[in-house]
Amino acid sequence: MEHFAAIDVSLELSSVCVVDGTGKIVSEAKVASEPEALVKYFRESGLAYTRIGLEAGPMSQWLHAGLSTAGFEVVLLETRHVKAALGAMTMKTDRNDARGMAQMIRMGWFRPVHAKAILTQEIRALLVARKQLQARLNDLELCLRGILRGFGLKLGDVGKGRFERRVRELVAGQATLESLAEPMLRARAALRGEYAALHREVLRIVRNDAVCRRLMTVPGVGAIVAVTFKAAVDDPGRFKHSRDVGAHFGLTPKRHQSGEVDRSGHISKTGDAQVRTVLFEAAHVMLLRVQRFSALKAWALRVARTRGLKRAKVALARKLAVVLHRLWADGTEFRWSREAAASA
């Protein structure tokens, strides 16, 4: 008989529920949230598992890799679908969540999430760490600006290189302000150094990656955009059509249709928010900074004239997702005009 298992993952102990092909609960347990412990539990049960599932989350990729390596058929469940399916339960517990997910897996009522390769996960972790240091650096600078502004001291529009010198000029001769500015400037210098180190590592990865270099032939797409997009997609073959990529990253409008009502709303904003951000930034650069014209930019400018600049940037970001995927899948580079594309 077929058996299906669900794992509701927690930091220390995970709830496991096993059901048979009829939906009857065969076993339930609390198991340590370690790949070795879960593999041991499933092997010692003596059952043949058709599918084991767990909700996508911070530890899920790690557990998925361990169980898959042990030979089990493992799927990651899309978080929004799990939440919607289990939302009707009046009692939310880890045990009930595992039971509900086990039935979802048995019936096939779920959307699987792509499990990324280990190398891709490492690059994603590097990008997250870089982004966090960048955010903390910006927070520190804004905090220092705010403190000084309270005393009528305005830094004004200064670049990163002149920031520290300008602060010292403003607080000179004011003992209290000097005493609080000094440790904050030291912390800023340390953050800048560590951020620069991570940024250099990202650039090194991009230089040695043929796919990233190909994606960077698109105007407006720099190293960070290219590597962020590549790490998020991981495998271009998982999208049957390039046009699906924009929807995957939440860049297509939501739609509500019921009876005579049929309306489109704002973009869905599902999927990876960081990818949406870098694609929007790339669209901004193409529209406002890249001087050379292309068929893609001309199209976006026509949208801007009729729908406004912000909508044009969103539409261009969606187009960029499609173009980047197509270049990756085809192994081609960006063509600036339709004529060049036709002759290729």
What is each PLM-predicted segment?
Residues 49-57, 101:
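Acidic beta-strand-to-loop metal/phosphate-binding motif
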Residues 214-217, 223-224, 228-309, 343-344:
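Phosphate-backbone recognition surface of nucleic-acid-processing proteins
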Residues 1-20, 101:
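Gly/Thr-rich phosphate-binding beta-strand-loop-beta motif of the actin/hexokinase/Hsp70
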Residues 35-51:
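Short, basic/hydrophobic alpha-helical segments
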Residues 127-214, 338:
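Glycine-rich, often acidic, oxyanion-interacting loops/wings at catalytic, nucleic-acid
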Residues 12-36:
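Short glycine-rich, Thr/Ser-proximal phosphate-binding strand/loop in the N-terminal lobe
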Residues 260, 297-344:
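Low-complexity, acidic/Ser/Thr- and charged residue-rich accessory regions of DNA metabolism proteins
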Residues 75-121, 125, 132, 163-171, ...:
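Short alpha-helix plus adjacent loop in nuclease-associated cores
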